[in-house]
Amino acid sequence: MKNKKRVLIASSLSCAILLLSAATTQANSAHKDSQDQNKKEHVDKSQQKEKRNVTNKDKNSTVPDDIGKNGKITKRTETVYDEKTNILQNLQFDFIDDPTYDKNVLLVKKQGSIHSNLKFESHKEEKNSNWLKYPSEYHVDFQVKRNPKTEILDQLPKNKISTAKVDSTFSYSSGGKFDSTKGIGRTSSNSYSKTISYNQQNYDTIASGKNNNWHVHWSVIANDLKYGGEVKNRNDELLFYRNTRIATVENPELSFASKYRYPALVRSGFNPEFLTYLSNEKSNEKTQFEVTYTRNQDILKNRPGIHYAPPILEKNKEGQRLIVTYEVDWKNKTVKVVDKYSDNKSFREG
């Protein structure tokens, strides 16, 4: 009887210990979960605060920079999208306040997107009824509107660039000194730098030979286009060509190589990053700039089905452009859009 009582007491004691242990574990787990949740909320709030600060700083800000003891940078951004042409202009205006220089200084970075507007079309009235319209050229044009007191002193990129990726850095030092180098990174100490970086695989960037102190133009033009196992020049009428019995007038896309193999600038579009450095006489309070983004399209015309008829190539046959006029207030360091216009014109040299 005594042994049975001892076993019962021991069993009750073990159950009590197990229950106490489980309760302690659950309490610790709940406390840890609470700590983790508090930590997560703290991190999330910190990240949100940091994100808000970065966003606000990027949009409109005045921040000190290494351009001298009392130098500072005021940043403005203007964005304009045109639905009809599917072109977006995003311009960054960096006003450099340099007390050691007797002129206003401005860096304008031209960004945004020019969508490819790649299209397959059917034109039953023609023998070569299956058409492919693709972006053979992209153009960015920047000019000072009728104001001799504001001048363009430098630009990026310069000359002709054929590499798949373009990277360059512009550097400004106190006293109005400036420099530019290939690659990303500061070019010297005690300077303010701005970089450009964009992809142009199978295309070339060409800075127009007619550039002057009030006008600069960049052309990004298709060269040798690679798709799948093929490599063909833009001037080759057999570019993207496909001769197959399954192609019909109702399915023009089947007369050409699969679009998923096309280079990114053909398939999706182009994201420009071009830079202009300007100076302005302090007696001049306002200046207007006209910025034009243009997409030129070549048309390839194929006859559906198995045949021996040659394809037809028509260069720069169509185009779309977005023209925006911006006004800079030098005294208040502000920018506003004063005019916007778009049409279906391609860029023509001359």
From Swiss-Prot:
- Name the family the entry cites: Belongs to the aerolysin family.
Q: Know the name of this protein?
A: Uncharacterized leukocidin-like protein 2
Q: Where is this region: Disordered?
A: 28-71
Stretches of Basic and acidic residues bias are at 30-60
What SUPFAM superfamilies is this protein classified in?
Leukocidin-like
Cellular compartments per GO CC: extracellular region
* Keywords from the UniProt entry: Signal
One GO biological process term is: cytolysis in another organism
**Signal sequence region:** 1-27
Q: Does the keyword Signal apply?
A: yes
Q: Where does the source fall among the domains of life?
A: Bacteria
Q: Does the keyword Signal apply?
A: yes
InterPro entries per the record? Answer: Bi-component_toxin_staph, Leukocidin/Hemolysin_toxin, Leukocidin/porin_MspA_sf
Q: Which species does the entry assign this protein to?
A: Staphylococcus aureus (strain MSSA476)
